[in-house]
Amino acid sequence: MKTMKLKGLFLCLVFLLCNAISHAADDLITRQVTIKLDKAGTLPDKIGSSKKYKITNLKIIGEINGTDWRLIRDMASEDDYGRTKGKLSTLDLSEAKIVKGGSFYYNDDGSKTSNDVLGPYAFSDCPCLTNLTLPSGVTEIGDFAFRNCKGLTSLTLPSGVTKIGRCAFWDCYGLTSLTLPSGVTEIGYDAFKDCYGLTSLTLPSGVAEIKSGTFCDCSGLTSLSLPSGLTSIGESAFSGCSGLTDLTLPSGVTEIGIYAFSGCSGLTSLTLSSGISIGGSAFKGCSGLKTVSFCINDDLETYLTKGHSYIDVDCAIKYYLSGEEITSIVIPSSVTTLGEYAFQRCSTLQAVYVSWPTPISAGSAFSGVGISKCTLYVPQGTETDYFLADVWGYFGNIVEYDPTGIDKVTTSTDAKELSRYSVNGQRLSAPAKGLNIVKYSDGSVKKVAVQ
């Protein structure tokens, strides 16, 4: 009898506990709560302290300032002291306007609101937010504005936005879809760092510079459209973007920073334009890179070192790839000088293609390469000249080929491949190891070294 009473008491307690939990969940306000503000800074007067942590869906109409924003952050589970009990997940500010004034909304001596600016740290560390509509008048996204907003899966920025601050979306790894307005001209460094949920992105035509770390570790990114006006790609800009498989850089790009594409292990094809300056280890760890197209207008040593203090003396060509993985290299006729140790320790080099009618001085350019095991491809009728020349004559095999008719290296993304040939003029049905000659629909012809 006593045992039955204890069991009954236990079941009663379980029932009361479950009921309390259910009641707590039911206590959340899930319907949309719409609040119209007649004056900025009055949101705290509209929402009592007993309700602010229960509202999950909020729409605000009217002007809002720092005082209002401080409460919004509190309701979205973050304040100056860390995590709060806020449950705000859906926020509609489509009919709101951000204005200057009010209290600091982030730290007591930190950020204040400015007219039509989504300020620094506006939603930083608010993981509860899953759906957000910004005021239509916003023109700028501040630094760290959405940092660590892990709950956001998609976001459309207002059409008037022209600037995105540094680290603005850092660690928003839940973000899978993002539309950037056409008027955006500036994106801060580390802006999308660790957004590995993003799969595709189109950069607006006005963006001329991709700054350091902008897309660092966006491993889910498989499709990227770069604007034609792009001129510079910063340090580690795409480092760790292992999902990228092919990339054509706009012809206007003149500089690629150090480690810019390091760790892009999925990259298999790359097109570089002439006159480009490439930083050290820019393609380090690109183990899948098999096809590289480029042309050089300076002598090789000057070209590779131009504008950089980071010089890899072991193998300058590492600025294109990891030197130990290079099996073939095409040296354009525009190269007039081979600098000392230009290919030093490229131990896997198997083929070198040149097009000079008369051998130029090679000096110590191939020191440590082991050219006795390499094949040298030279213009027709010049095999004897190269055989008798210093350095060139030490190549294990010298083969003549016809390099004529090679017009230019194209970087156009519109041109389509029409046909592909070997250096002997044989039609190829697919890329073949060594030098391929490819004709395109725009009339251009490209030499492509396939490893």
Regions found by a protein language model. Give the residues of each.
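C-terminal tail/sorting-segment detector
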Residues: 4-6, 437-451
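Bacterial N-terminal signal peptides
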Residues: 10-19
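Sec/Tat signal peptide C-region and signal peptidase I cleavage site
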Residues: 20-25
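Structural signature of tandem-repeat unit edges
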Residues: 30-38, 56-64, 86-116, 127-140, ...
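Short, T/G/N/S-enriched strand-turn elements that build extracellular solenoid repeat scaffolds
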Residues: 41-51, 67-77, 281-282, 340-344, ...
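Consensus positions within tandem repeat domains that build extended binding/scaffold surfaces
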Residues: 119-122, 142-147, 165-170, 188-193, ...
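Residue-level detector of functionally pivotal "anchor" positions at catalytic/ligand-binding pockets or at interdomain
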Residues: 401-424
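Short, surface-exposed loop/turn motifs with a glycine/proline- and acidic-biased composition
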Residues: 422-442
